[in-house]
Structure formats: structure tokens, C-alpha cells
Amino acid sequence: TTQELLVEMEDTDDLRRRFDDLVERHGGQVIESNLSRRDGCIRIELTARLEPPITHDEAMAFMKENPGVRRMSV
């Protein structure tokens, strides 16, 4: 399944690793990415092949577990 993901979060090594881990748990193969930084935050927009796709509930749990995540779209 091809899925578009967007995450805005504090720009820390730990949060980037946690997001990468989430994508990898779904067998993520990045097709396209767009990255930008602003005011201590990073915005990551990905188009990726994921199996299974990341669900709304998983996105909510990821945000709850990682307070530095400000926005996430799946």
C-alpha cells in the first residue's frame, strides 16, 4: 500500500529515530520525501510503501507516547 505521511515534531535525534522505527515496523520503503526545518521543528512529508499502512489509532498512540510530536497525518 502506498501511503502519504506527514509529521511535524521537535527536531531531535530521538524523535527522528522513533519516527523512522515506526515506518520500518511497517516495512517502509520511501518513494519520495520532503524535509524542512523551522523554529526548532522538523517537518517530514513522505510517500512510502507500507504493509500494513499506519492507522489513525497508531498515529494517535505515537503522538501520545511522544509529546514532541506536534502534528501527524496518515
Language-model segments: what does each one mean?
Residues 1-35:
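Canonical alpha-helical transmembrane segment with a positive-inside/aromatic-interface signature
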Residues 18-24, 55-68:
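Short amphipathic alpha-helices in soluble, non-transmembrane regions
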